[in-house]
């Protein structure tokens, strides 16, 4: 059974303690309906070598320990165990000399986002759809006091816990992950900064989702939104067919201008499109740690400006706004 007692104690002592009312039943439901592989993944965590990291560097590659801080045997054991948690999608990580070359170069996204953030020093930060938690560690690097990630993916939880387990306690105590979605979160209005990166296009009701994000941010706090967009003006919104870039669960792709209008209608202020970037096959690709299909397989082989279905290839925008 997955234990969340440490995370819940931290939550009770935080400005977000009201969240406990809805979160506790969700975690009970999670425990009562585990993923079929959850026990196997948990066994991996119990078998990780007991290593002490003297050096932690939360930079482009999130590094925990150095190669000379682990024996060859421990490093080989660590490699084999972490490979059992594939696919690794968001990173990269370097754990005692074991380099996890993830599908996404998530550090590239952070480099696009970071210059446009309010100062995170001392802030309470939430990442909605945090994946394996790579960006949570980068938020701590930027000075956040506490970072909270939510994502319903059980494998992401196990990957996050594997990284956290190898971290010194001082870092572990500031990063928290709950395997839940945003749907049942109360209107906390308590987070200084809320991130949502790579989630909006998966939502059937994107405007409702934006309103939910707004309800979590304190007055004056910042929203950082990253999502796939299409070219066009403030009236342009595309709903693809059954698949977009081979993804079944893509619903609405607005232009950056249309998305800005949505945010304005919801009462956000200081709305700014700070980045507009075409996703490249160097940023999202197959690796030894994610051996399945990746972006190159989802694009038209004769025209990489289009998806395999004939739509515009993924362009991602970053928009910041305040409450």
From Swiss-Prot:
Q: Kindly state which keywords UniProt assigns to this record, in alphabetical order.
A: Transferase, tRNA processing
Q: What class of enzyme is it?
A: transferase
Q: Which positions are annotated as binding carboxy-S-adenosyl-L-methionine?
A: 90, 104, 109, 129, 182-183, 197, 201, 316
State the EC number(s): 2.5.1.-
Q: Which SUPFAM superfamilies match?
A: S-adenosyl-L-methionine-dependent methyltransferases
Top-rank taxon: Bacteria
- Return the CDD domains for the record: AdoMet_MTases (cd02440)
Cite the Pfam families for this sequence.
Methyltransf_9
Reaction(s) catalysed by this chain, per the record, are: carboxy-S-adenosyl-L-methionine + 5-hydroxyuridine(34) in tRNA = 5-carboxymethoxyuridine(34) in tRNA + S-adenosyl-L-homocysteine + H(+)
Query: NCBIfam families, from UniProt?
Result: PRK15068.1, tRNA 5-methoxyuridine(34)/uridine 5-oxyacetic acid(34) synthase CmoB
Tell me how this protein assembles: Homotetramer.
**Any idea what job this protein has?**
Catalyzes carboxymethyl transfer from carboxy-S-adenosyl-L-methionine (Cx-SAM) to 5-hydroxyuridine (ho5U) to form 5-carboxymethoxyuridine (cmo5U) at position 34 in tRNAs.
State the family it belongs to.
Answer: Belongs to the class I-like SAM-binding methyltransferase superfamily. CmoB family.
The name this protein goes by in its record: tRNA U34 carboxymethyltransferase
* Species name: Idiomarina loihiensis (strain ATCC BAA-735 / DSM 15497 / L2-TR)
């Amino acid at each position: 059974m997955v234990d969340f007692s440490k995370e819940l104690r931290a939550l009770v002592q935080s400005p977000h303690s009201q969240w406990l009312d809805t979160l506790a039943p969700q975690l009970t439901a999670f425990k009562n309906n585990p993923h079929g592989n959850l026990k196997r993944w948990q066994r991996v965590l119990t078998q990780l070598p007991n290593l002490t990291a003297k050096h932690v560097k939360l930079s482009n590659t999130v590094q925990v320990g150095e190669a000379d801080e682990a024996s060859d045997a421990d490093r080989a054991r660590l490699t084999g165990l972490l490979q059992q948690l594939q696919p690794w999608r968001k990173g990269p990580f370097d754990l005692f000399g074991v380099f996890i070359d993830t599908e996404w170069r998530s550090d590239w996204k952070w480099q696009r986002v970071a210059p446009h953030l309010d100062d995170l020093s001392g802030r309470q930060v939430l990442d909605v759809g945090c994946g394996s938690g790579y960006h949570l560690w980068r938020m701590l690097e930027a000075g956040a006091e506490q970072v909270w990630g939510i994502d319903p993916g059980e494998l992401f939880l196990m990957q996050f816990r594997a990284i956290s387990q190898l971290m010194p306690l001082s870092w572990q105590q500031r990063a928290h992950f709950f395997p839940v979605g945003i749907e049942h979160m109360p209107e906390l209005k308590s987070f200084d900064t809320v991130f949502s990166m790579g989630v909006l296009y998966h939502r059937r009701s994107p405007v409702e989702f934006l309103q939910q994000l707004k309800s979590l941010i304190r007055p004056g706090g910042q929203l950082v939104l990253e999502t796939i967009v299409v070219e066009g003006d403030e009236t342009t919104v595309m709903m693809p067919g059954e698949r977009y870039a081979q993804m079944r669960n893509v619903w609405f792709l607005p232009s950056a201008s249309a998305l800005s209008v949505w945010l304005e209608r919801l009462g956000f202020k200081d709305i700014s499109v700070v980045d507009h970037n075409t996703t490249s096959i160097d940023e999202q690709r197959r690796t030894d740690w994610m051996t399945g299909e990746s972006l190159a397989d989802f694009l038209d082989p004769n025209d990489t400006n289009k998806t395999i279905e004939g739509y515009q290839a993924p362009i991602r925008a970053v928009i910041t706004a305040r409450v």
